[in-house]
A protein has these predicted regions:
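Class I (Rossmann-like) S-adenosyl-L-methionine-dependent methyltransferase catalytic domain
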Residues: 1-38, 49-97, 114-121, 125, ...
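Nucleotide donor/acceptor-binding cores
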Residues: 41-42
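Conserved beta-strand/loop positions that form the S-adenosyl-L-methionine
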Residues: 46
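A conserved beta-strand element that flanks and buttresses the S-adenosyl-L-methionine
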Residues: 106
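Short catalytic micro-motifs in class I SAM-dependent methyltransferases
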Residues: 109-113
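Glycan-recognition surfaces
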Residues: 129
Length: 193
């Protein structure tokens, strides 16, 4: 299967996404979270899109960002914006970046686009990719719910905070806390012991 077929509809909606996602929503929350990391730390950005605003903020703050996205159009834009960043056009499930480890992983706006079993796979793969004391930040609604994605018109699924806590605990990961951004998006801050 081509990476763009695993983009959850974002290859087809890439132009609209890039025009809509240039806002700074989430940047202050991600920057607050990243303050616990040492400048220069390696961060894997899963579902990085065109890199704005999350990868951009992390790069500006001196982190070594590795971006992964299944949309060829979004990845092309990412590479143009950040030519020195590591980038891979791939679904996270197939990413070669999981052959190494990272100080942190972010998945902002990705988790709920995935089917439930793939969400659990993502958490498992992140655990394996994190260094000891590595940090993981992802977004998904607190409530267990299903809705239609505004850009792709595809189904989005939140498994709910309690389910995420249980999966994280089963993987040996520690939920450090929850944060919200100015758009009321819920962030789960996780640490690998």
């Amino acid at each position: 299967m081509e990476p763009s077929e695993k983009s959850n509809g974002y290859e087809e909606a890439a132009k609209l996404f890039m025009s809509e996602r240039d806002s700074l929503t989430g940047v202050s929350t991600v920057r607050q979270w990243s303050r616990t990391l040492v400048r220069g730390s390696s961060i894997l950005d899963l579902g990085c899109g065109h890199g704005v605003p999350i990868s951009q903020a992390l790069i500006e703050d001196g982190f070594a960002v590795y971006g992964v996205d299944a949309s060829a159009s979004l990845m092309e834009s990412f590479r143009k914006r950040f030519p020195s960043a590591h980038a891979e056009c791939s679904a996270f499930e197939d990413s070669a970046f999981f052959g190494r480890t990272f100080d942190a992983v972010v998945a902002v706006g990705l988790m709920f686009l995935l089917q439930p079993d793939v969400q659990c796979l993502l958490i498992h793969k992140v655990k394996q990719a994190l260094n000891s004391n590595g940090q993981f930040l992802f977004t998904s609604p607190k409530e267990k719910c299903i809705w239609q994605d505004i850009l792709t018109h595809r189904e989005s699924v939140s498994l709910g905070a309690q389910f995420y806590r249980e999966v994280l605990q089963a993987e040996g990961l520690i939920l450090v806390g929850e944060m919200s951004d100015e758009g009321n998006n819920l962030y789960y801050s996780v640490r690998k012991p």
